[in-house]
Every structure is written in structure tokens, then in C-alpha cells.
Amino acid sequence: MDARRKHWKDNTFTPFLNEHDFQEAAAPPQPLSEQSSADNHKRMGRVSNFSVRNTQEGNKFKRKDYSSQIAEGEQDSNLRERRMNVSKNDANTNSAFWDSLHLDDATKESSHRRESASAWNKKKLPAATQVTRKKWTEAMPPKLRLHLLNEELGELSLKCREIERDFENAEKELLNFRKEASVKAVNFQEPGTGASKKDRELQALKNDLSEKATNVKNLTEELQQAKEVMYRLSLENRNLKDAVRKLKHQTELNTALLREEMKLFYELEMEKIRLELGAIKNELRVEKTLRVKNSRALEVLGRHVASVVRSSNPADHFTGNIF
């Protein structure tokens, strides 16, 4: 596991110097034939590295160790064959170069199509889902929308923290790999067959460095997008909180006004009832007074009638008294 991790770190970033820089500075001038053969070797090595790099672009990161070992074995065998057959490699150089160019063009075209398709999906699909979600959430009550936005804000906060943590780890790894690459560049002076191996390692480090830089850039963009979404959701959350606070205040005002109206209505009704009760009491009092007056008048009238009857019929009284 440690050896694999070390190899992965070695294949992650490239130094700024390679073995050719040291050899070109220290080597004496070569004859024309030896220089042409060396140029052919160098060109074939670059073409082979170029083709291997293009074929390895679509692989996953976990399979880089195995593919780099296979590429090293193939390139070692190619170097031995080129040293034995220098004249034959001169004729095969052009064909390998054009094949690698065609392969590079096809790989770039396919990767460009994949990137364009993925970019369209990333741009169109989130926009459509965002519009649908917005229409769906606008029909909700404010409290439910506030609850959902709080949950989404918490999830985005966790995601943002994870992205920041990954970004910090990637920056730390980048710094460590650059230090290791610089140390390897200073100590990188092995002659012979080790030169081609170091060239391949340098190329792999360059490829991994570009990939790491792309990953860091993507993480930075995702972090920025997450921050923008969090800012937008925080604004919506604040607006919803303001709306809920206003609705609560309005509800309290309406409740207070309703209580005041009910109190006034109760007082008015009680006043009306008291007035009606007083009027009824007055009527009863007047009725009692009239009844007393009528009873007295009837009594006086009865006495008067009785006296009149007695005075108008004395014989009847006399006869009645006799009998």
C-alpha cells in the first residue's frame, strides 16, 4: 500500500527540469550520424509517450499504476529494439508519428463531444429542475417553504464544508508533490536506461499535475457555485423570515382589533339591554300605578253606585226590610 501510494505521488506532479536538460548541458557535441540516430530515438520516445498518454486519458485514476507499468515495459522493449535496429526505426518513425496524430485527433474529438454533452446536461438539466422546483415551492405555505429551505441550506452547508475540506487536502497534496518533484528534479541524474524511465516518470508526473490542477479548478468552481447557492438560499430564507414575521405581526394586530371590536360590541349590547330593562321597569311601574288608580276609582265608583241605588229605591228597601 505504501509503495502504491508512493508511486501515485510520484506520478502526480512533474518537476520543472528533466534529465535531458542535465545531459544536454554536460554532453559534448556528437557526430552527425550519432546525432541523427539520437534524434530519431528521442523523437520515437516522444511519439510513444504521446500515444501512451492519449490512450490513458480515458482511464480511471485507480488503474494508472498498472497502465504506467505496462507502458514502461513496452517502452523499455521499444528502446532495446531501437538500439539494435537504428536504421529500421528511421523508416517507421513517420508512420508511428502520423498514427499517433490520428489517434490524438480522434481522442480529442471524442473527449470534446463528451465534454460538450456533459456541459449541456450540466447547464440544461439543473435549470429545468430549478424552474420546476420554484413553481412547486411557490404554491406552498411560507412556513413549509421556510422549513424546506432551512433543510436545503443545511445540506448545502455540509456539502460546502466537504468541498472546502477536499480543496484543502488537494492543496496540501499539491504542495507536497511539488516539493517532492523539486527534490527529485535536483537528484535526477541517472545515466543510461534510467534516463528513459525518468523521462516517462516525468511525463506521468506532468500528466498527473495537469489532472490535479483540473481537479482543483473544478473543486474551486463547485465551491463557488455552492457559496452562490447558499447566499441565494440565505436571502430567500431571510425574506421568508421577514414575511413570516410580518404575517405574525399582522395576525396579532388583527386579533387585537377583533378583541377590541368584540369588547365594544359586548358593551354596546349590554348598554342596549340595560336601557331596555330600564324601559321595561318604567313601564311596569307605570302599569302598577295605573292599576292602583283604577282599583281606587272602581272602588269609589262602586260606593257611589251603591249610594245612588239606595237613595232611588226607598220602598224596595222598606219592603225588603219588612219581609
UniProtKB/Swiss-Prot annotation:
Task: Identify the keywords attached in UniProt to this record, alphabetized.
Answer: Coiled coil
Instruction: Tell me the organism's taxonomic lineage.
Output: Eukaryota, Metazoa, Chordata, Craniata, Vertebrata
Q: Give the start-end ranges of region Disordered.
A: 1-81
Residue ranges annotated as compositionally biased, kind Polar residues, are 48-58
Q: Which organism is it from?
A: Mus musculus (Mouse)
Give the protein family: Belongs to the CCDC160 family.
Coiled-coil blocks: 144-289
UniProt name for this protein = Coiled-coil domain-containing protein 160
